[in-house]
Structure formats: structure tokens, C-alpha cells
Design a protein with these regions (language model features):
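Secondary-structure transition/capping motifs at alpha-helix termini
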Residues: 30-32, 107-113, 144-147, 165, ...
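Cys/His-rich microdomains that often coordinate metals
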Residues: 160-162, 178
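Long, highly charged low-complexity segments enriched in Glu/Asp and Lys/Arg with interspersed Ser/Thr
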Residues: 113-121, 126-150
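Structured beta-strand/loop patches that form or line metal/cofactor-binding pockets in enzymes
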Residues: 6-30
Length: 180
């Protein structure tokens, strides 16, 4: 089966704040690597996913009329399969377009560090989109292997010894961390 024909893929869930709103990122995985990302505002009355659920499956459903939607399926604490139909209804069109672009880059195998750098370099005018961007960066940084080095100089000691530790860029010389 061709990658573009995938109907169901494993997914991780990352929750984040976009301004004052609670948002959710569905990170679809292929071979344990991010393959696509969907984000949306959490609307518990329309789509409740228990806070302890952080894994499941994204299912692409093609309707008879040719339209498509995305569902999310997870196993609850009692072992029952739950399917949330139409998670795509949560996707604001503007954020959806950025997520489609990021997903396209992921599908073509760009290294996660480069994808994160690309997202970091986006200059967006809206404060809402900027806080969304930070949430997406945080979601994807989780997939960068510990010890992955960058060419960045440490803002504290000036050494080129920055590497990822637990999804956070950290100086291996002085211990400075961008995460605080």
C-alpha cells in the first residue's frame, strides 16, 4: 500500500494552550516518526477525549459522496474502543492550511529538527497563530532524539554545544536550557 493510501495510522495526542484556549494536536505516526499533524480547539461538549488519553489512531474516512473526514479512535481505561467521528470539524481553516503544509513536509521525510526550525522561522502577524505555532513546535520537539546536536550557539556561554534533551534545546557546556 502506498503511503498516500493509508487509512489508519497510530497517533499521539499533545495538548497545549493557544492564547487562553485549550487546544489539541493529533500527531499521526508512520514507523514511529511524525507523518502528519492536525490541531484544533478542544470543545468538550462536541468532542471529549479524556485527559489521560495520549495515544490512539487517526482514521481517514472517505464518504460515498467523495468528501473525507478524519476520526480519532482510542482505547479507554476499561479496554473499550471509542471512536470520535469528524475530528476535522474542529480544524479552523487558517490553522488547517498551516498544518497541511507542515504535514506535507513531514511526509516527505524532512528531519524533525529542520521541520521545527522551519516552523520557528515563520513570521506570522496574528498573536493567536504565533501561540499555535509554539504549541506545534512543542508537539514535534518530543520526537527529536536526545543528544541531537544543532549548530546554534549557546546564548549564555557562546559555545556551539547545543543539543536536544527531553525535547528541549540545552547547552552541553554550561547547562543553559531554552526551556528554563
Amino acid at each position: 500500500m502506498c503511503s498516500s493510501d493509508l487509512k489508519s495510522i497510530p497517533a499521539d495526542i499533545v495538548r497545549f494552550k493557544n492564547g487562553n484556549e485549550n487546544w489539541i494536536a493529533f500527531v499521526g505516526l508512520q514507523d514511529g516518526r511524525p507523518y502528519e499533524i492536525f490541531t484544533g480547539k478542544i470543545e468538550e461538549d462536541a468532542m471529549y477525549i479524556p485527559p489521560k488519553i495520549n495515544k490512539g489512531f487517526i482514521i481517514k474516512v472517505r464518504e460515498e459522496n467523495g468528501s473525507k473526514r478524519y476520526d480519532f479512535q482510542y482505547i479507554d481505561r476499561y479496554g473499550y474502543t471509542n471512536t470520535i467521528g469528524g475530528i476535522s470539524r474542529l480544524f479552523n481553516e487558517e490553522f488547517w492550511n498551516y498544518a497541511k503544509l507542515i504535514s506535507g513536509v513531514l511526509r516527505h521525510g524532512m528531519p524533525i529538527t529542520n521541520v521545527v526550525s522551519l516552523i520557528e522561522s515563520l513570521h506570522l502577524n496574528s498573536e493567536t497563530i504565533n501561540t499555535w505555532k509554539l504549541g506545534v513546535e512543542r508537539a514535534l520537539k518530543q520526537y527529536i532524539s536526545d543528544g541531537t546536536k544543532t549548530k546554534d550557539k549557546c546564548p549564555s556561554c557562546g559555545q556551539e554545544t547545543m543539543a536536544y534533551q527531553n525535547g528541549c534545546l540545552t547547552c552541553m557546556s554550561c547547562g543553559y536550557s531554552k526551556c528554563g
